[in-house]
Amino acid sequence: MTKKYLSLLLFTVLCLTINAQTYQKSTAAAASFTINSDSTATVLEWFNFIEGKGLVLSYTSTHVNLQEKVKVKQDTYSIQNLLSSVLAGYDFETSFLQNKILLQIKGLKRFHVSGCVYDQKTKEPLEGCIVVFMNKNQRQYAAVTDYKGVFHKELPSEPSYLNASYIGYEPSIRVFMTGKYQNIGIGMMQTAIPLNEVKVMNSPMSDVVNYRGASSMLSVNSNDPFAQINTLPGIYGSSVGGGMHVNGGQDDENLILLDGISIYHSHHNNTLLSQFNGETVEKVSFFDSFIPAQYEGRLSSVTDVRIKMGDFTDHHQSIGLDLPSASLTLDGPIIKNKLTYMISGRHSWIDFMKDLFSDNASASRAFNDLTGKLHYRINPKLAVEGLIYHSKDEYKDSINQIHNHKILGWENSLYSVSSHADLPRGISNISSVSLSKYSNSIYGPAINIPSDIFINEGMTKISVKSNFSKEVDKYMNLSWGLSMGHEKYNLLASQDAVKNNNQKITQVSSYINSRIKITDKLSGSVALNLVSYLPKNSKSYFSMQPRFTLKYAADEKNIISLDFSRMEQFYHNVCVGEIPIPTDLRMPSINGFKPSSSIHGELGWKRMDDNWRFSLSTYYKRRYNILGIRYDISNTGYEGWDRFIMKGNAESYGVKVHSMNQWNKWRLNCSYTFSKSVEWFEDYKNNKKNPTLHDVPHLFHCATSYMVGKDSFLSLGGYIKSGSLYNVYNEEGNISGQFISHRERRKINYRLDANFSDSITPQKQHLKFSYKVGLYNIIGNPKEDEIIDLYSIDTKKHCLPYFSLNIKF
């Protein structure tokens, strides 16, 4: 009986204890708060408000911003609901004990948002689309889609909506549904009037131009994909037939790719002519600081031009008439939603009318090119493409009493087949097989060779590439690949000789590149490129080229970056004159001509606002084993390149500033570069450092456009730059053949251009007119080659009026 009473007593005590604990818990948990009107206060002030009701909050402030202002709407709240409103962006847990609240704040909530952006009509992914996320407090975060149109972003707060923007497409705004943040599909519609502009992506800070730049408006061509690149800081354009000097480098140190396939000499015989037909270009990626590991073979920059495919559902035609050339472009489906075509051709036309414009009726420059692409979508995970490109440049003049005789010419050809596949385990692959050719010829008598023959030189390359990529997780993305190429050089045996010398070279390379998200604010890429260079009859070389970049996002608008790249170049091209000819030095790394190499470091800061982008960077570049022409000796009677070419080193450094603004109806694009470029050679002036011929200490570009109407713009812009250097030398005597030489700087170069552009859409929506009328060199003192190469047009004060027209139907 005693045991029975004891058991009953223990049960009663236990029930009372549980009831007391429940009462203690419910004392705090049952508290309610009435907010009479919408109120905004800091987190700390809201905590004080809760404690003012007789409750005790116990928390640590390590993972919460007590000064953040939070708005709470008018209502009656339980303690749990009020804390959920005040700490809406945080992960936290609560427990209650009498009038005490134990608050465990774990940190900010993380929302992983992902999706794909594509063309609503063709279903093609849109690479480089900017996706901006905004939360309820109007804070913005941005992401950029990859080549598959996919984006990923970790957000510190719940997004309310996103805004996707892409060149030539209407902006797409998407409101988020609560909890649905993954695998978002965003279809975008093209604008009624195409913007006629490609996207330019510029390393080191992924500068994606998402509106029509003022500098692009000033191009003489109706659609010039390189107009904006030529005005970027650190870039100094060279003369006709040449390329550009990037960060103090030579013009043979820039790699030009067409759909990932190298082009030996993509430039044409006129500075006003775009390298490629803008109607065929989808996008241009330009790298001059951190160069991704899949690119190799040049020291200073890489320009990767991607050719667009045809429309999957409708046929389109485009006719263009510019000052340099006329063009025709056709594209559309062969099998709807399966097989498309795109074909485009350009041809110079002023050479047909040269008699009306030139004092010398027999001198002319002719040009034509052809670009074509087939795209076959086998299934959603596999597609095959075929690309063809051919260009031809000629210069004709009177010689040996023969009028309109071909003097000089060069040709480029490229053929490739590629596949794009999504493999198992999230791996993507792009593989290609390609054939590229370059040939150059000059009429013998034009260079004092009496034989009535053409001197020819050229190169042929067959290559196989396979690139892979995989998103390992939200913190790492890996890419790797392997390529093999076989080159055949048809070289002149010597600078004066007509005989050719064939050289065969095999090159094998591999790379790995990892993009890593270290923290929410710190990310980077580490890459390595390995090359085996295997000439048939000369010394072999093995190259290791490490590269890395580090980016720190101080906040949503400011990015600090640090880049390093080591590059190696196995191809040398030294031009004796302004225009490339077969007797120039074109030499692979054989017969004692070692590879050139470079190291490049750059520290940059970039600020991105809604309508303003600003970047500032400083760089240092060191180049080893570069080649130069000796101007202090005569080449009379010379039978080889050895005494005519110098080998040495060079360095360059500078500061680059770039600003792009857009407000109301105005657009402004400005860039400034301060730089120094020097070189030194063992066989020249006792190895003393001397400014390079392309040393331009100050270079300023500026262009502005005013939106007169919906698609009408009035643009004004130009440049001011230090004059470049040139060699001055006089022969001392005929016996020694020695020269006394020094370098002098030309006068300051400047130029001012203006134009008006407009687009008109008649009632028939399938017909669109775009035109441009302007003045080239209204006032100025440009380099002489910018004037004499205007298709031999001679105008007073060299002010050239121009007109371009583009019709789409």
Residue ranges of model-derived segments:
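Short, acidic, small-residue-rich periplasmic hinge/interaction motif at the N-terminus
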Residues: 22, 47, 51-54, 59, ...
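Periplasmic N-terminal accessory/gating domains of Gram-negative outer-membrane beta-barrel systems
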Residues: 87, 139, 144-146, 168-170, ...
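Flexible loop and strand-edge segments within Gram-negative outer membrane beta-barrel domains
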Residues: 350, 383-461, 495-503, 580-582
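Surface-exposed extracellular loop regions of Gram-negative outer-membrane beta-barrel proteins
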Residues: 439, 534, 538, 552-601, ...
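Outer membrane beta-barrel strand-and-loop segments of large Gram-negative receptors
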Residues: 455-457, 461-467, 503, 507-511, ...
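C-terminal beta-signal and adjacent terminal beta-strands/loops
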Residues: 720-732, 751, 758-809
